[in-house]
Structure formats: structure tokens, C-alpha cells
Curated annotation (Swiss-Prot):
Source species of the chain: Zea mays
Subunit and partners: In plastids the minimal PEP RNA polymerase catalytic core is composed of four subunits: alpha, beta, beta', and beta''. When a (nuclear-encoded) sigma factor is associated with the core the holoenzyme is formed, which can initiate transcription.
Residue stretches in coiled coil: none
Protein's recorded name: DNA-directed RNA polymerase subunit beta''
Job description of the protein: DNA-dependent RNA polymerase catalyzes the transcription of DNA into RNA using the four ribonucleoside triphosphates as substrates.
Amino acids binding Zn(2+): C220, C296, C303, C306
Amino acid sequence: MAERANLVFHNKEIDGTAMKRLISRLIDHFGMGYTSHILDQIKTLGFHQATTTSISLGIEDLLTIPSKGWLVQDAEQQSFLLEKHYYYGAIHAVEKLRQSVEIWYATSEYLKQEMNSNFRITDPSNPVYLMSFSGARGNASQVHQLVGMRGLMADPQGQMIHLPIQSNLREGLSLTEYIISCYGARKGVVDTAVRTADAGYLTRRLVEVVQHIIVRRRDCGTIQGISVSPQNGMTEKLFVQTLIGRVLADDIYIGSRCIASRNQDIGIGLVNRFITAFRAQPFRAQPIYIRTPFTCRSTSWICQLCYGRSPTHGDLVELGEAVGIIAGQSIGEPGTQLTLRTFHTGGVFTGGTADLIRSPSNGKIQFNEDLVHPTRTRHGQPAFLCYIDLHVTIQSQDILHSVNIPLKSLILVQNDQYVESEQVIAEIRAGTSTLHFKEKVQKHIYSESDGEMHWSTDVYHAPEYQYGNLRRLPKTSHLWILSVSMCRSSIASFSLHKDQDQMNTYSFSVDGRYIFDFSMANDQVSHRLLDTFGKKDREILDYLTPDRIVFNGHWNCFYPSILQDNSDLLAKKRRNRLVVPLQYHQEQEKERISCLGISMEIPFMGVLRRNTIFAYFDDPRYRKDKRGSGIVKFRYRTLEEEYRTQEEEYRTREEEYRTREEDSEDEYESPENKYRTREGEGEYKILEDEYRTLEDEYETLEDEYGILEDEYRTLEKDSEEEYGSLENKYRTREGEGEYEILEEESEEEYGSSEDGSEKEYGTLEEDSEEDSEEDSEDEYGSPEEDSILKKEGFIEHRGTKEFSLKYQKEVDRFFFILQELHILPRSSSLKVLDNSIIGVDTQLTKNTRSRLGGLVRVKRKKSHTELKIFSGDIHFPEEADKILGGSLIPPEREKKDSKESKKRKNWVYVQRKKFLKSKEKYFVSVRPAVAYEMDEGINLATLFPQDLLQEEDNLQLRLVNFISHENSKLTQRIYHTNSQFVRTCLVVNWEQEEKEGARASLVEVKTNDLIRDFLRIELVKSTILYTRRRYDRTSVGLIPNNRLDRNNTNSFYSKAKIQSLSQHQEVIGTLLNRNKEYPSLMILLASNCSRIGLFKNSKYPNAVKESNPRIPIRDIFGLLGVIVPSISNFSSSYYLLTHNQILLKKYLFLDNLKQTLQVLQGLKYSLIDENKRISNFDSNIMLEPFHLNWHFLHHDSWEETLAIIHLGQFICENLCLFKLHIKKSGQIFIVNMDSFVLRAAKPYLATIGATVHGHYGKILYKGDRLVTFIYEKSRSSDITQGLPKVEQIFEARSIDSLSPNLERRIEDWNERIPRILGVPWGFLIGAELTIAQSRISLVNKIQKVYRSQGVQIHNRHIEIIIRQVTSKVRVSEDGMSNVFLPGELIGLLRAERAGRALDESIYYRAILLGITRASLNTQSFISEASFQETARVLAKAALRGRIDWLKGLKENVVLGGIIPVGTGFQKFVHRSPQDKNLYLEIQKKNLFASEMRDILFLHTELVSSDSDVTNNFYETSETPFTPIYTI
């Protein structure tokens, strides 16, 4: 024995791998016997050391990692940012999920790596460290759970739980973490049980399929082989692993010298020589051909040389060794072991992290932007995708770094950006080879709140199937859930009202009878307009009506408009009025009165006469908000001031008005009458009882209040026509909105004014007492100044209203005197007496109380009782004659020393009254009056600016203020709504004499999918274009069910009409985009202001020809003077929709249409999809103020902001709009001059191909399914998932992407190769090439699964099994042979031999069998019957008369014979005389073989295209494995 001093002392810990290497070298050097002796000594030494060390494990030995705290904090911060982006709608749910998994996975992995170095540095002799890292007990992942963190877990359904487990077992888990980890532990227990059984069964099947494979012969005589060459990117380690233990299939030459001969087994020395040779001459070295079990020519056994060295002791495998069973167990055993690993880490979510390229130094990065295009990463961040390999330079201060980025990688920085050292600049996309196990997963997104669904125009609104409600997204877009409060009642109103708001009675309830359910999915969706209700009074068409509706199936209406109060959100649009937001003049800004609503009236046919009232608005300062009714009184400025300024103007225009009156009277008469009556029907239906009685009451309305002074009376006759008629008109027009009682609504109004004046107003006497109980009030007393203006005259047409300048009265101030009126049913019992004096809140009847205190007057009529309460004090004067009745007394001036100065600060109105039965007794009522000053500060005209690009036509807008109530007129209220006293009007005028009218139309402009409406007024020469022949009997009709017929659209118009309309340039804008496909153009409608557009004949049912590009820019000015940006560039993202005329008056709606609209009026918006169906929002919605967010804009930035903000637009949270951060995401609901209101909404980003559940406007409750994503998920490479994969490969099941790809490739090869080579060569060679390729591919896949778990299995074990799975071919039906049946499965070698023997071609195709099918297709029926389906197999074998030659192990075990391996092997070997001549034949054949090799290697080009070159042998493309075929 050598001296100790010379022994090498190797001070290094020894783990399992080192031990394997040591044993392998000992066997090489000393052989088996001596090695076992040495190992025995090592064992004794180990046990001795372990005993003396007495390692024990305590809780103090679990050292936590110091950096864990800030790592977790960092991950939490990233998660928080992620959550925020998701909330803003910047990323979608799947991206959030992926990123979340990767954040926590990366944190967990980093902690795992830190753990090793932490133990090694701080405490190398730590028992935990010693145990787990030596492999003695436990492993790294289990220790990681003790001292690291678990991360994200899966729930029982396999879905990720979003809360990661941050604590480890050393620190202790919180309650929530404990419950979540229990999920994982349960999953681990169940997995272990199930998967262990699976692994065991897999082992059984593997052994079953190869149990008969025994080494029976030294050499099978094959000269085929597989080429191995390190040139194809194979690592040296893999090269060595692949070659050692194999046998060469051909001689190896370097230059002309042979360094290794055929059939020589390869040891480590020979491999080193190969490597040296390759390094010396890398390009001239030939590939090395080795023999594998695939190349063995025997059918049911294997030869020594094809198997190679035995892995146990490094010599060639011995004859009689059962290598099949060893192979099956070698593959099955690691599976059984590895399933046990899942016990602790059960359910932990893992994700693959991508390969990253980092910057080598600080500097500016540059690359060619033409070679990249923008995209989104898997995590939703912006990036650039490389088309080709990209060259990137990073310029630091002194050096230029160059980085190559491979094809299909993602660049995560911008060009010319400054990057820091080690910053991630690119992500290498993982190869999309089939080796990645991916699965398609559905992810459902559920609504997080109640709300109503809204989507952008990118969704096709027609469902995917006719009766379904699923829709596919054609491109990535947002879905929005608009917040609402749900009220579950089916007839609840869509209410935005606060106390004392003006509201339309139609919206009190939506009548359920008219809601039709057309959707098969039971959603109250599409109320198709214009359905016949089948009742006579609601017929769709009356062919005798002079003006008929032309309906083109497309309803265009406008957005809900804005009124003056924040809460007053209801659109105040009746018939054709449009409300526009205005702002006060700068001087009044300090008052902070919010926006006014301007109402525009566009008359019949959209034609405005000169001096027509074009728009008006009601100033909230002149509004009486208190409930009740009363009288308005006013005074004028002195006559001289007024007359002096205006006299000349009147003279010049006098003639003009007269002629104008004659021209237009007849033209407009008939429609106007129709308009009035039609309007009346709609309005009086609700307030029927009151109106029926009030109408006659007002004809005989009597004066209860006192007598006006004499001077007021003289001019009464002159002014009643001029002053009254317009007022009546206005009152009627306004009535629907405010529920005023229409005082002058009488039949005579429709006749001539002159005849009716006497009847209507009667004559007034100072003390007339013939048949009246009280004095009659002088209703129409006018100031004396009016008489001078009388000669100007006021022209009032039935169709349009024009102003003479008389109406610009300069009223100083006016007064409102309060009183209260109650109209009670005749039968009601009164609780107060006539002429009594009551206080405030006195009970009048059972249900009504007084709001004012004062004198009560009761008047009983035929059908009802009127009760009036006059507020104020009552005095009994001594001398009645001295009282001046009806006078207004101004407030007293304050005197400093006067104590009574506080008494009267307001104006008072003095009225003279008399007692009933006495003609002499009078008393005086002194009533408070509210004074309103008139103000000239509001300048409307500036809000309708003249356009800069205007041509020579010049429209002028003038401002007129007038008072909406006559002097001393009783203004009564039934519904106690607000009274408006002053109305400001905008009057249209122009200078050109030849222009007869101005045409107003509404232009709808669609810019970038946002629609805005503008009002356009233009001068026209003649109105003939816009009038239609009244009694034209063409077949114009409504389309009954609102689905336009695609073909017969020609019946809409007669030729003449089309010509007359088409002379004008504008047409209804196209709804077809460039590709002529239907876009999803959804128009947000306010359903209570529908407008019918004209239809112009064309091939397309819902559109006319493309808009005429010659529309001048000046036609498109906004109401607020904002020119729409770049509207002149007509491109695919801009649509200009102009509508030919405005045809909207109430009388155009026939009854059934009106009914339908009333249904819609309770709801706020309507929508149209491609199929022209109107979808309504559900009626069960309440919008509450807290759903709305106000945003006030900085004054300077408003002009810029207007171009960006549009009504109906959706804005994401945190968007920066000109010094303004949006606090909440939502839809712009109201736009004011200095602010806008958002309706809160939550965005959800959805990708292409996602499925949207439900329809537009559908009401979703919290937790309803909103959208379903389908995305690809990489399956984690956990062995528990890996084992099923291995099983699938072995079973050749087409469950996921592996097998179909392979099967598809086999099909391709089966078809292509016979085509190239022809028949009969084709089938033989085609099948062989196909089988060779599929075998290599399968080996790679199985090895990948095991290598991912660190398990090393020698390739030859897998090869033996794959050989059995792929060794059959199926006889094809292409050529009928006499030997085999079509479809019969036979071995490849048998088919070749049969073909040779018969001298005829046999047609067959390669087939991939699974291990189970392969076990049931062997030569032994006893083996098959003992595996599965015993009865079927035995019956079939008996019928066929099969013979079992008992060659395998199993058959012999079953029958109790000697198994043919080991010592029992000798019996089964029969030497054949051919063996001796074998080598001789091979020498002769070699010549032909080398030529064939060139032909047959075509297949490497054919098949290597769809595989990726990776860095190792069995994971490379198939190119290196080139089988050699010799025939």
C-alpha cells in the first residue's frame, strides 16, 4: 500500500452526481469486484461520520433570506401598478394574469437562488443545507417553502388565486394564507395519489410493449445509421453523451487515415479524438454514423451492436439480456419518483420567464425603425417586433457596443432612447416549436358593478348567430360598463329629476304594452320602430294626407342637451327644437350662473324667412321659481329714446313686410294648421279634464283684481292683434315643455284674427256688473307709447314667426305679483269660505293645502270649482275715490333715523276691490311685487360667430329681448312649474335682396368614430327645391317591420322628386366605408327627439352615394364656433354625414309613430345596429347624481379642449386634458362652456376574437359574465403535468399540439416522397423516411420532459420503446395485393421482405401506434390476452387459428415455462449458416449503398423546415440524424 503522503486529498463535498461519476471511473479502472469493495468502505465511512456528527434539525436552523422583505415589497408595488393599469383599461385581464404570475414567479425564483448563496456564505454546516443540498433528505423546493415563499397558488378548479402567499413556514402563515395553502396541500395529496397510480400504470404499459425484446444475436447485419455531428449547434457535453456506449455504423476517416472502424464501440478516448479532429478541421470533418435500436433489422429482438454498451458495467451488452424490460422500467421509475415531489409544492403556479437581452453599458440606443413595427407584448406593454435579425448599436461615451437581436424578438425601448447598463432592451421570443406544451384556455371576465354595457364602434353589433347574443370582437377595443342604480320595477322611470325640475309627463312611466320582445334571448332589446299595432286608430299610412313620411330605416337623433341647472339634465327638446349650451358674457362671470339652454326652432322644411325667430333661450334670472301663479306688470322706457333710435329702420322695412306676408301666407297655411291640431292632440291627452273646461273658461275670463287706469285702456284695441298673436303662438309652442295653461287656446285662433278679436277678448268696462261677480281685469292693457308703433304692423304667418322691430321693447323693469289658483273637481268639499282670509298652509280640501296666505275667492263653474288666493294685506280706506287702482308703488328710500325703514323694501301693488252686494264699499288689497330689471348684457350673436371662410352671402343674427307675458296678464300654473318671464330671441336677417330664405339644416359630422351635430344656416335663392308636390300619389310608405328589403328600394320616390332633391349638393352621408362592408355605426340617440331623414335612391339600402367632397368647409361651423379639426381631409377615419332637410314637425308623425315615440321618450338613448334595429336601454335604470363627476376647465384652455372633448365620448381615468387630470373614467354626458360632466364608467380592454356576452345597452348586474377571452397558456413543466404529456406521446393521442403536428407531418411525408421518387420505390423509401423522422421527433419530446426535471434517461431506452410504437405500416388500398388485406397492420420489415419475395409492389403507409395498441398488435396472443380484453383477444386468435411461438418473457411466465433470458437463453438460439457469409455480402453491396445515400438524403431538406434548431442533440432539428438506408 502506498504511503499516505502521496495520496491526493480532495477536500470537496460529494453529491449524487459526483458519486455517479466516481463509481463509473472506478469500474473503468478496477472492474466490478474491486469497485464494490471500495464503495463498501465509503459507506462505512459515511455512516460513521453521520453518527458522530449527530445532525438534528431545529427551528433556529431555518435561516430566512435577509433581502426577502424588499423583494416582496417590490413585487407588491409592481402588482399595484398592474392593478391600476387594468383599472384604467390599459391592459386586459389575460395580460394582467400573465404579468402577475411572472412577477411573483420571478420573485420566488430569485429567493430560491438567494437561499443557496445565503446558506453557503452564512452557515455552510447548517443541517438544513447539508441535508437538502446533498440529496440526503428533501430538496431545494421544499427548503424554499420553509425559508423562502410560496407565491401564487391554484384553486381546486386550477384557476389562479390572485393573493400570493408571501410568508414562509418559518415566519408562519396568516389565516388567509393558511387556507389558500390548504387548497394547495389538498391538491398535492390528491395529485400524489392519482399520479402515482398513473405513473405505475404507465410503467406497466411500457414494460408490456417491450417485454419480448431480448439481445439475441451479435450483429443483425444492418448498414443503416444515424449521423451525429457537432456542427449543427450541438453542445460538447451532449455530443459526448450521445456517442459514448454506441457502436459505429461506418468507418471514420480523417483525411485518408481511418481512425475508427465499423462495428467498433465508442469509449471516452475515441470521443476525445473525434472532438480534437472536429476542432482542427471543423468544416472538412465527416459526420459520424452510429447504430441505434432504430436501425436494427430484426423484428422481435435486438442485436448486440445496435444496442451498444450496457449502462451497468460499460461493456457490450451480453446476449440474452432482457433490455426491453430494463428500458420500460428506466422510463417508468422516474415518473413514480417525481410524482411524490408534488406533495409539498402542490398547486404552486409557475411560469416560464423569457430570455432577456440587457444593455452592456450606459448610452444611447439606435436601430433601424423601418425593420420593426409596433406591437404589444404579452403583458400589454408597447414594444417593437423585429421582422429580421436586427443590428442594434449602443453609443456610450468612449465605445460603440453592437448587439444582435434575433428574428421575432421584441425590442422594449425606443430608438434614440438613453439606456442604462444592464437595462432590459429586448426579449427573445421563445421558439414556437411543438416542444412547448401550450393549451387554449378560456378566461371569463365578470362585471365588477351594476351597470349598462356599452362598446365602441369596433364591435359588430349584429350577433354572431341570428338568435344568439354572442358577438366577436374584430379588433382590440374597450367595453364600458356605465354605472347606474338599479330599480327592479319593470315600469320605473328613467329619472334624473330633482325637486322642482321641469319634466315631461311621458317620462313618468314607460307603458309596458308597447315594449315588444323580439330577441330570442329574452333580453328586452330591439323595439323595432314602426311596427303595426293592428289597431285602426294607429294605422301606419293614410294615403290622403298631403304630406307623407318618407322613412329610410335610419333614425338620426341628437344627444341629450344641456339645460341651465346642474340637475336639470332632461333634454328640453320638443318637435324640432335643439338645445345648445351657451355662456354668459364676461362681465357676469362673477355671478357663476351656470349655462343657459338655447332652444332653436327650425321651421317647416328648414326654411327661415327674413326676421324669423331662429333661436331663443330663457334667462334663469328672469324665472319665478316659487310655486304659484300671478300677474306680470311692466313699464317701458320713455317713448322718445326708443323712437329716435328706430324710426328710420321701420320705414325702410315697412313695405318689405307687407309683401312678405302675402307671399308666404298661402304657402304655409295648411301645414301650420295641421301642426297646431296635431300638437294639441299630443299635449292634451294627459291633462284632458283641465283643458276641456279651461278653454271655455278663458273666453269669458273675468277680471277679479281691479281696474287699470284710464290711459291704459285707450290703446287696447290697437295692440291686441299685434301683441297678442305672437304671444299665443309662443305660449302654445312652449306649453308642452312647461305645462303652462294656454290662455288663448281657442278655436278662433285658427280663423282670421280680426273676426275673432271681439269674441275672444270682449269689451272691458271699468265697473261692469251685468253678469259677473267681480271686476273684469283688463287683460290686454298696453302702455300708451305703443300707439305710435301701431302703424308698423306685425306680420304673423301660420308657418313661420317673424319679428317687426317693435318687439325690441326696451323694458326697464317688470314685476311679478304672486297669487295662487286651484282648480278643483266640482264635487270636492271645500274647507274654506269665499271671501275669507286664511294663513299659509291652510287646508283647502282633503288633499290640498294653500301655499300663500291671503284673501280667498271661490268661483263655481259647471264642471269644476276655481279657488284663488290673493296674498297681501287688506285695507279698508275711508274714501274710495282717492285710491288709484292697479298702481305700483316703489320701495321707500331708507332713512337713517326712521325706525320703519325695514318695513317695506320691495315694490307693492295696490288693487281696488269691492264687496259683493254693495256697489259703494271698496277695500284695497296691497300685494307684494317682485321687481325684475331688464339687462342688455347677454350677447347671443357672439356665440354664433361669423365664419372666417364665409363667402359673399352674409347672414346676420340680431338679438331681441321680449317679455313672454302680456302686461297685467294672469299667468297660471297647473303643475306649479317655473315661470319664465323674459325670453331672449335670436333673429336671422341678411342683406341680399335676391335671397328669399335661409335654409337651416343639422349637420352630423363623424370624426374618428365620434359624432357631433352642427347647425348650418345657408342662404338659398328659392324655396322650390324644398317643397314637395302635396297631392302626389306615389307609393311612399313606411316600411312595416323596419328591416329594409335589400332589393326593392326603388319604390320610395318618384323620379321628379329625386331630381328636385339631387340638385342640391349635400346628400345623406355614406354609412358604407371604403370596403363597402357594413360598419357598426352606432348613433347615440336621444330617443325623444327623433328626426326622419330623406332617402335618396341607391343600390345600398341604408345609405346613399358617397358624400360629395365639394362641400365647402364653411358649412361646417360648430354651434360654439369651433371648426372641427381637419374635416376637409376625407379619409377613412372621417365620415361626413350631412342630411338633406329637416322634416321634423310633430304633425309628420302619424299616430302609431307617435305612440312608439312616447314609449321611447321615457328612455334616454336609442341605438341602431347594422340590421337597422333600434335597441333601447333597459327602463329599469336610475341615474343618480353620485354617478356623475363634474370637471371644471381652466378658462384659457377651453378652446383647445373643445376639439378633444365630444359629447358621448369615453374618457379613461388619469387622462391629462390641458391642466386637468380626469379623476374617474366615464362617458362625457354634458358639456358646458366651463365644465363637463362624466357619467362614471369602468373600461375593460378586450382583444381580437374575444366573445362579448349580451347586447349593447344591456343591464348587467354585479358578477354577470361580460366577456370571454381565449388565450394560449404554456403548461408548466412540472412533472405532474409532464407525465400525462409523456403518456400522450407514448400513446400517440392527438390531445394537444404534439401529436396532430406529428401526424400531419407523417401524412405529408407519406404523400410527398412517393410523388418525388415514384412507385414502387416510393412506398418503401417513403415509409422508411417517415418512420425515421417521427422516431427522432418523439425521442426529443420525451427527453425534454424528463430533462426539465433534471432526470437523465439514456436515449437508447426511449429508442427501444419508440421503435415498437413506430414499427408498423398499414397496407394501403391504392394497389390491391394478393398477400395482405387493405388496412391490415404489418411490420415494416415484413412488408419489405414480402415485396421482395413476390416481385410485386405492395402499397403501404407509415402509421403511429400508441403503446396500448402496440401491446395488442404483437406476435403473441397470450401476451395480448394477459394485458387487456382477454376474451376478445382469445376468441379472435381461435377464429384465426393463430400460433404463439412463445418467444417473449410474458408468454413463458403465463404458461410456466423457462423464460428465454439469462441461462434460459441458450435453448432459443439457433445458429443459421447465413451468419458466416454476411460480411462478404456487405462488402459487395457497399458500392451501391454509397450512391443510394446521396439520393435518400433528400429527405433532410423535406422535413427539417418545421422544426427549430436548439442547443442540444435531441432537441435540435432533425437534420443531424440522417439514417442510412441500404437496400
